[in-house]
Swiss-Prot record:
It is found in: Cytoplasm; Cell inner membrane. Residues 76-79 are annotated as: G3. Belongs to the TRAFAC class TrmE-Era-EngA-EngB-Septin-like GTPase superfamily. Era GTPase family. Residues 55-59 are annotated as: G2. It comes from Rippkaea orientalis (strain PCC 8801 / RF-1). The keyword Nucleotide-binding applies. This is GTPase Era.
Length: 314
């Protein structure tokens, strides 16, 4: 992998100059409002998978933006929603825990539609927080001509708490310079937490697994994406070749059949696309071999959830 996502080397963390600022920014919001796309844009590299399917993000991801004057660690959280299984409960608990573990909270909403019950629920969660909050109106590029009533539905929520409001498009990058400046202004003086050239603290295997899961999200539909867990079982590396062996875990035989596809066509397509994404991050050639396993009701099993890397984060 590139230097940015190699394991953290404490010796490469410099001493911050006088006046340098740093801190953690929690990105929260309903599912599918563009939180992961936003973080990818802010750090300048794809570290969080994106998909039109809601609840794409399952873990609290950290993305790191370092400028001459500040280091901002963005924490991308799972979308806050009403959970329907044990996995969902863990995701929501982790997202809510992030609210109490950051220096600034960035609430991201979809400004192509009016505020709804999910947005108001998040505002209620933040009712008594002492952490600075910014309301970010994302998807400004997708707003209809008569967008004023939509904006007003969110401005009412922000004005009740004196939250600053910033409008932007995570997809096009419009307005993100203003967002970055606002965040830096709110940060306190602080040290470098990570080397300046690092963009995420996630290990290589996690990134590999997420790239595979992203292709499943993009190439399958309905219940399949939420029933999938990826386990990187083995990685073999030489100077010119990285061999990755990964298991795709599903809950039912029918789901296994869909992922494999007719004569293995779907599995091949998933593997080819995921390998191409890995190739952008890894020096040398990449060989990716995928297996599909059935683990009945793994989303309801505390043991399986832990084995697959899903647990309450502190």
């Amino acid at each position: 992998m590139t230097e940015q996502i190699n394991q953290l080397s404490l010796s490469s963390i410099p001493i911050a100059p006088e006046g340098f600022k740093s801190g953690f920014v929690g990105i929260i919001g309903r599912p599918n409002v563009g939180k992961s796309t936003l973080m990818n844009q802010l750090v300048g590299q794809k570290i969080a998978i994106t998909s039109p399917v809601s609840q794409t993000t399952r873990n609290r991801l950290r993305g790191i933006l370092t400028t001459e004057e500040a280091q901002i660690i963005f924490v991308d959280t799972p979308g806050i929603h009403k959970p329907h299984h044990q996995l969902g409960k863990i995701l929501v608990q982790n997202a809510e825990a992030a609210i109490n573990a950051v220096d600034i909270i960035l609430v991201v909403v979809d400004s192509s539609i009016e505020a709804g019950g999910g947005d108001r629920y998040i505002v209620e969660l933040l009712e008594n927080t002492e952490t600075p909050v910014i309301l970010g109106l994302n998807k400004s590029d997708q707003q209809p001509q008569n967008y004023q009533p939509i904006d007003e539905s969110y401005l009412v929520l922000a004005q009740a708490h004196n939250w600053p409001v910033i409008k932007f498009s995570a997809l096009t990058g419009e307005g993100l310079d203003n967002l970055q400046k606002t965040l830096i202004n709110l940060l306190e003086p602080g040290p470098y937490y990570y080397p300046p050239d690092l963009v995420t603290d996630q290990p290589e295997r996690f990134i590999m697994g997420e790239l595979i899961r992203e292709q499943i999200l993009q190439q399958t539909r309905q219940e399949i994406p939420h029933s999938v867990a990826i386990v990187i079982e083995k990685v073999e590396e030489t100077p010119t070749l990285t061999r990755v062996f990964a298991a795709i875990n599903v809950e039912r035989d029918s789901q296994k059949g869909i992922i494999i596809g007719k004569k293995g066509a779907m599995l091949k397509a998933i593997g080819t696309a995921a390998r191409e994404q890995m190739q952008k991050l890894i020096t040398g050639e990449v060989y990716l071999q995928l297996f599909v396993k059935v683990e009945p009701q793994w989303r309801q099993s505390s043991l399986r959830l832990s084995e697959f890397g899903y647990q309450i984060e502190t």
